[in-house]
């Protein structure tokens, strides 16, 4: 399925049905009086966040959505039926913005959240409502109210606990495949990943989180270079960022500096998120080169990097557990609780004792 994370749609609620002008006609009843029913209300346009979706591709080919019109009222006091509602289903994490693409209407970040985009018009009153002591046979009724219409933007920001960032060809997709059951496209050239990929990390039956791999950033991405910073929105909700640096490249310090600069240029406090720095592809280096590269990266970043390899699996579990600690803190647990739960249980000397 193709990935689409933003689109513009037009929605229109239904008009209300008009009220009826009608009089009771019955044998032996000379003055039956008015009996016109009310018109039905127009249908609403709703939007709902549902699980199981991770793209807005359904709205790529159909952008116009109109709810049903209310039915007109009829004689004998019969009211018109309401128009059919329209329900738009979108992935969890979808934001609804006004046509200016800046004003946020709603952030549907929880499954089951709903929002009424356009309210249907009320149905008009039939002439039965206008009967009074002065005018006992009104020959007029109200028309139905018009529905609402508007253009809105839908922008998807994926719900991920941990985000992977790095330069193109840093090994992010290989790491995602090693850590989860996801199978992203992997190749030895830059920009293999063109759209975000999600995977679920299962450390144990009770320890799991969602990991997001976004397309690589290059210098000047904030100004539109490469794929730009458009996909950084998909890690805005993450509790922690895993910054992968390719250990086989020559300029280790420059790689880290480039990504940090683009995160700061993007804004939205992305640069302030917790960061776990990892030197990737260490399986291709000898022990001495590993130490030298790690020291160089620590000198420029001030963070001791973890040594990992998505190919051999070295250090992957340790890195994932470090990320999960930050996720648990984000979920409301204290650092102490997270550390206690992750600490290995000490075995009783001499085996089990009653």
UniProtKB/Swiss-Prot annotation:
Enzyme Commission (EC) number: 3.6.5.-
Q: Where does Mg(2+) bind?
A: 173, 193
The segment(s) forming the OBG-type G domain are: 160-328
- Give the keywords, sorted: Cytoplasm, GTP-binding, Hydrolase, Magnesium, Metal-binding, Nucleotide-binding
GO CC field: cytoplasm
Question: Localized where?
Answer: Cytoplasm
Residue spans with biased composition (Acidic residues)?
A: 339-348
Q: Does the keyword Nuclease apply?
A: no
Q: A Gene Ontology biological process annotation?
A: ribosome biogenesis
Pfam hit, one: GTP1_OBG
**InterPro entries in the cross-refs:** G_OBG, GTP-bd, GTP-bd_Obg/CgtA, GTP1-OBG_CS, GTP1_OBG_dom, GTP1_OBG_dom_sf, OBG_GTPase, P-loop_NTPase
Chain spans, region Disordered: 333-354
Its biological function?
An essential GTPase which binds GTP, GDP and possibly (p)ppGpp with moderate affinity, with high nucleotide exchange rates and a fairly low GTP hydrolysis rate. Plays a role in control of the cell cycle, stress response, ribosome biogenesis and in those bacteria that undergo differentiation, in morphogenesis control.
Describe its assembly.
Monomer.
HAMAP family xrefs = GTPase_Obg
Please name the NCBIfam families in this protein's record.
Obg_CgtA (TIGR02729), PRK12297.1 (NF008955), PRK12299.1 (NF008956)
- Family of the protein in this entry: Belongs to the TRAFAC class OBG-HflX-like GTPase superfamily. OBG GTPase family.
This chain belongs to the protein called GTPase Obg
Show the taxonomic lineage: Bacteria, Pseudomonadati, Pseudomonadota, Alphaproteobacteria, Caulobacterales
């Amino acid at each position: 399925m193709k990935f689409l994370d933003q689109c513009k749609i037009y929605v229109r609620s239904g008009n209300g049905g008009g009220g009826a002008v009608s009089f009771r006609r019955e044998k032996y009843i000379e003055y039956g009086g008015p009996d016109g029913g009310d018109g039905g209300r127009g249908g609403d346009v709703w939007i709902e966040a549902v699980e199981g979706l991770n793209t807005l591709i359904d709205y790529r080919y159909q952008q116009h959505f109109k709810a049903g019109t209310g039915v007109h009222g009829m004689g004998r006091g019969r009211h018109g039926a309401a128009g059919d509602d329209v329900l738009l289903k979108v992935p969890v994490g979808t934001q609804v913005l006004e046509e200016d693409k800046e004003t946020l209407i709603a952030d549907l970040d929880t499954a089951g959240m709903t929002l009424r985009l356009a309210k249907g018009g009320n149905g008009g009153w039939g002439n039965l409502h206008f009967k009074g002591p002065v005018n006992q046979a009104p020959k007029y009724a109200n028309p139905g109210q018009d529905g609402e219409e508007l253009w809105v933007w839908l922008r998807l920001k994926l719900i991920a606990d941990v985000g992977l960032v790095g330069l193109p060809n840093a090994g992010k997709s290989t790491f995602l495949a090693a850590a989860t059951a996801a199978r992203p496209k992997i190749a030895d050239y830059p920009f293999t990943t063109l759209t975000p990929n999600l995977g679920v990390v299962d450390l144990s039956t009770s320890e799991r989180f969602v990991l997001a791999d976004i397309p690589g950033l290059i210098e000047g991405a904030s100004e539109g270079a490469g794929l730009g910073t458009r996909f950084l929105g998909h890690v805005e909700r993450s509790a922690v960022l895993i910054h992968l640096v390719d250990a086989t490249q020559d300029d280790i310090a420059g790689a880290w500096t480039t990504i940090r600069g683009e995160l700061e240029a993007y804004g939205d406090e992305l640069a302030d998120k917790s960061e776990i720095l990892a030197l990737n592809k260490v399986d291709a280096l000898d022990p001495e080169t590993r130490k030298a590269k790690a020291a160089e990266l620590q000198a420029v970043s001030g963070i001791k990097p973890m040594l990992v390899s998505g190919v051999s699996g070295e250090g992957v579990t340790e890195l994932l557990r470090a990320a999960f600690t930050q996720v648990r803190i984000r979920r409301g647990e204290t650092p102490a609780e997270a550390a206690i739960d992750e600490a290995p249980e000490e075995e009783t000397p001499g085996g089990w004792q009653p």
